[in-house]
């Protein structure tokens, strides 16, 4: 069963991803440093949750891009065969 995150944690993680897409990583420790650097939160638990959700969000985003590229390649292959 997955974790349930509040809207605030999701919002902050998405904003971080949008602003610092090139620095966001699929590694938790790297994202933890990113959160420490750019987010002003005093709670360690909240920082860790934001970093964890950001990690998952990056992985999901990468998978979507890869799937979209694969489907485009497949469409191109099908068009070239006909």
UniProtKB/Swiss-Prot annotation:
GO aspect biological process, one term: translation
Top-rank taxon, per record: Archaea
GO CC annotation terms, alphabetical: cytosol; ribonucleoprotein complex; ribosome
Chain segments annotated as coiled-coil in the UniProt record: none
SUPFAM superfamilies, per database record: Rps17e-like (SSF116820)
UniProt GO molecular function: structural constituent of ribosome
Keywords associated with the record: Ribonucleoprotein, Ribosomal protein
Pfam annotation, one family: Ribosomal_S17e
HAMAP family for this protein: Ribosomal_eS17
Alphabetical list of PANTHER family matching this protein: 40S RIBOSOMAL PROTEIN S17
Similarity-based family: Belongs to the eukaryotic ribosomal protein eS17 family.
Record-given protein name: Small ribosomal subunit protein eS17
Organism expressing this protein natively: Sulfolobus acidocaldarius (strain ATCC 33909 / DSM 639 / JCM 8929 / NBRC 15157 / NCIMB 11770)
Gene responsible for this protein: rps17e
């Amino acid at each position: 069963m997955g974790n349930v995150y509040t809207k605030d944690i999701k919002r902050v993680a998405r904003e971080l991803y949008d602003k610092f897409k090139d620095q966001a990583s699929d590694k938790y420790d790297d994202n933890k440093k990113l959160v420490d650097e750019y987010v002003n939160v005093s709670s360690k638990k909240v920082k860790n949750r934001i970093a964890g959700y950001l990690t998952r969000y990056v992985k999901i985003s990468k998978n979507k891009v890869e799937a979209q590229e694969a489907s485009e390649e497949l469409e191109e292959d099908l068009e070239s065969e006909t």
